[in-house]
Regions:
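Beta-strand-enriched accessory nucleic-acid recognition/scaffold domains that flank the catalytic cores
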Residues: 2-384, 391-404, 416-805
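A short beta-strand element within the Helicase C-terminal
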Residues: 410-414
Length: 805
């Protein structure tokens, strides 16, 4: 072909390409005329079936015609401090700030959930039970022994717990009140009574005051999230489908899945030998994981895992969670009134062994009951069954010792210990005298009066007091105070004062207590001065967290950071800070900052320590995590990549095609997720406008619910890429570019990929794994438990423990 014919063909194809861009621009214009502002961020081109280049050309055409393209961030409603980036196409004349009216930002496609919403069970307004079916068991009749327990008649269709022996539930009563607590079956309810509610309130208290008042929110009448699938249906006598009265917040099996690390709040108050054992085990676990990642054969997979591993190590330095003790698990507590004071019904543990119970927030060793397991008790079997997934039964005396635990869904950490064969020794001391008989509601409860506008006001001793709105913040302060006092050797009387106040703080928002008076009565100000007061290098006096344990997660403000951090030669991270000024609501010029933690910002954890042995142990651990994070990043920087092979792409063309299709499907969720985030933001903003006094906890619940509903309505659902053996062959042969493989790794199950990329040749265990065996053994793990943790046989573990390998 001559030059002119080639030019002619090129012109035709470029004209066709330009036509496609023009058509896309016209389509987007039509969308704007119908909807207003539209999201044109990552993934929208896939929905339109065009390339990224075509999309960019179409947007350029529209910009030339006076349309605006603005970037911004949608705050992630359930992830404070994080945002989802958006790119919005706007009609001419639109100001940048208008994109932050999220209810006005629409999607190009009108999303509908393809599975008709089956992925998320939509919340239905609850069905109400008539109060004639309910009886209250007051304190004097034994209700105080089971406070918070809802006993329901077995075999009643509209009150079935399904496959569960127990569940944390909400039941609407008479349309305007509700019951909240732990539901269990009962076989001895009076005739005509289907539900018995146990309360610590005294006889004569009206039913309406025993029950909770329904919230004025049709999406969340209980002020608490009902779990996915927490509502169910049954077929009535007429063959009609009816909504059950039971609304589950959590059910049997949900509590046992919680993380089983050891928080510093508990471990730092135990013996130094136990602190060192569990921190060393946590460190050796991480070292073994690092060694395993370094042995991976695929460099792209290796880099991806090293990056997330380094982030995990940085996080571990801040959160200071040690390795779990053998068979340690969270369990929900239920009352067994016939249980002895030194016993526990715990079928997940061996009959006759001893266990420690730890509740969070944890005050100290005086709150830890050490109990003997008795799994032969008839009442235990009747209430919980023989095989409860994640519950134990204790009596009220032990619940009270656990800093006043309730039976309405409170959990404890159960740790087998202190028996003759156990290597685990948990320190438990006598209950503090100053806590005996202390009841937060009796001591600091008040009376409520409504004003002319229907607003509640709370009074105690004739004086009005304010209700707590920031439980988490206040709880954090008093927990840090107790930790600092314990490490610095406070007296039992001083600890009792702080713990009494912490008990009031825990209950203050829920039970409307006068927590400010508790602060005064317990002399909290003088305790803070004595145990947390310090003078800085410039001579300024401060109070606040004063030991490494409490300082690690303490908030600190840093200059606003832009973009991703760069990795220094030593593996540490450098951030680009910007000095942005703004005028606050008082007209003062302020510099924009963002939140970080003191541990994240220091290079040496010892700068946060006051010098106690426990703090020094934690400082060693934190520094080892920081060092390992840097080492992982250095390894990441020096790892190469698989060369892209065109011949491999041809050989594995079907696999490449399949992987591309799977990736397209996974990435197509991005616009839906952005739309869900903008919708949820708009919903929560409207709720906050209608209810300016919403607490942080209420906002969090509303956010979770709004996001779940928004994801359901637009069909946003993460789709994990499943990689076949043949597709993995294609990846290893270089048939997929590094950029595309990274995208695939971001949308697949990391553990499966790690297994595929781990070499199988050697049977000898790495030094890190051998060290981990030794550390697990020192912490009391059995041979079979160590074998399970490492994925090897018990005989292999025995050989290493006996020095035969």
């Amino acid at each position: 072909a001559n030059d002119s014919s080639v030019r002619s063909l090129l012109n035709e194809s470029s004209e066709a390409r330009m036509n496609q861009a023009k058509q896309t621009a016209e389509f987007l214009k039509k969308q704007i005329s119908e909807k207003g502002m539209i999201d044109v961020g990552t993934g929208v081109e896939r929905e339109l079936g065009i390339s990224k280049e075509k999309m960019n050309q179409a947007l350029y055409i529209l910009e030339m015609e006076g349309y605006h393209i603005y970037g911004g961030g949608v705050p992630q409603v359930t992830n404070p401090g994080k945002q989802t980036n958006i790119k919005v196409l706007c009609p001419p004349g639109t100001e940048h700030k208008e994109i932050y009216n999220f209810e006005n930002v629409h999607s190009v496609r009108d999303y509908v959930s393809h599975d008709d919403g089956e992925t998320f069970d939509k919340f239905v307004y609850p069905k109400s039970m008539d109060s004639s079916r309910l009886k209250i068991r007051y304190a004097e009749d034994g209700g105080i022994q089971k406070d918070g327990v809802i006993e329901i008649r077995r075999g009643v269709d509209d009150l079935s717990l399904g496959d569960s022996h127990y569940a944390q539930v909400r039941i609407l009563v008479d349309g305007n009140r509700y019951l909240k607590g732990m539901a269990v079956y009962s076989d001895d309810l009076p005739d005509g009574v289907d539900v018995m509610f146990n309360t610590n309130k005294k006889k004569g208290t009206p039913t309406s005051d025993v029950l909770k008042k329904v919230k004025d929110d049709p999406d969340n009448p209980f002020g608490s999230l009902i779990k996915a699938g927490g509502q169910s249906y049954y077929i009535d006598a007429d063959g009609k489908r009816q909504l059950s009265l039971i609304n589950k917040r959590a059910e049997e099996g949900d509590w046992g899945e919680w993380a089983d690390k050891l928080p510093s709040q508990f471990l730092s108050k135990q013996s130094l030998s136990l602190v060192n054992k569990q921190l060393n085990l946590a460190a050796s676990d991480k070292m073994a994981e690092f060694d395993e990642i370094c042995s991976l054969t695929n460099p792209t997979v290796k880099k991806s895992l090293l990056k997330s591993f380094a982030d995990d190590c940085d996080s571990a330095a801040v959160h200071l969670q040690a390795a779990a003790l053998p068979r340690q698990k969270y369990q929900v507590i239920l009352p067994i009134t016939s249980m002895k004071d030194n016993e526990v019904y715990a079928p997940n543990y061996k009959n006759g062994e001893t266990v420690a119970l730890v509740r969070y927030p944890h005050g100290g060793t005086f709150e830890i009951p050490i109990l003997k397991v008795n799994n032969k008790l008839a009442e235990g079997k009747s209430v919980l069954g023989n095989t409860p997934a994640d519950a134990i039964g204790i009596n009220k005396k032990n619940a009270d010792r656990l800093s006043g635990a309730d039976f309405d869904g409170d959990t404890v950490m159960v740790i087998p210990c202190n028996s003759t064969k156990s290597k685990v020794k948990i320190t438990s001391t006598s209950p503090l005298k100053g806590l005996e008989g202390f009841d937060t509601k009796d001591a600091y409860g008040g009376t409520v009066k409504k004003d002319a506008d229907g607003v509640d006001h709370y009074y105690r001793n004739g004086k009005e007091y304010k209700i707590m709105r920031n439980t988490q913040t206040e709880m954090g302060k008093v927990s840090n105070l107790i930790t600092d006092m314990t490490l610095k050797g406070a007296t039992q009387d001083e600890l009792a004062r702080a713990v009494r106040h912490s008990m009031v703080v825990i209950d203050a928002e829920k039970h409307k207590l006068d927590y400010k008076q508790s602060e005064i009565d317990n002399g909290i100000a003088s305790l803070k001065k004595k145990y947390q007061g310090n003078v800085d290098s410039e001579g300024h006096y401060h109070e606040g967290a004063s030991t490494l344990i409490s300082r690690a997660k303490s908030e600190t403000q840093v200059l606003k950071r832009k973009g991703s951090p760069t990795i220094n030669e030593d593996g540490s991270l450098s951030y680009k800070s910007v000095k942005e000024e703004y005028v606050d609501k008082n007209g003062k010029i302020q510099v924009r900052t963002q939140k970080s933690t003191k541990m994240a910002e220091t290079k040496d954890a010892r700068t946060l320590s006051s010098g106690t042995p426990q703090e020094e142990a934690y400082a060693d651990y934190a520094n080892s995590m920081k060092s390992l994070a840097n080492q992982a990043r250095r390894e990441m920087m020096s790892t190469g990549k698989i060369a892209y092979s065109a011949s491999a792409k041809a050989t594995y063309s079907e696999e490449v095609k399949s992987l591309n299709a799977k990736l397209d499907l996974a990435l197509a969720n991005a616009p839906r997720e952005r739309q869900a985030q903008t919708m949820a933001n708009a919903t929560v903003a409207a709720k906050r406008k209608d209810n300016p006094d919403m607490t942080k906890a209420e906002v969090k619940k509303a956010s979770q619910q709004a996001l779940a509903q928004a994801r359901s309505s637009v069909g946003a659902k993460r789709s994990n890429i499943e990689i076949t053996d043949k597709e993995w062959e294609a990846i290893q042969a270089g048939a997929i570019s590094e950029n595309k493989l990274t995208q695939i790794l971001n949308n697949t199950n990391t553990d499966t990929i790690r297994q595929r990329a781990t070499p199988r040749a050697s049977t000898a265990l790495s030094t890190a794994k051998q060290n981990r065996i030794a550390a697990l053994s020192a912490s009391g793990y059995s041979t079979s438990e160590i074998a399970e943790a490492l994925g090897v046989s018990s005989s292999t573990v025995s050989k290493y423990l006996n020095g035969k390998e």
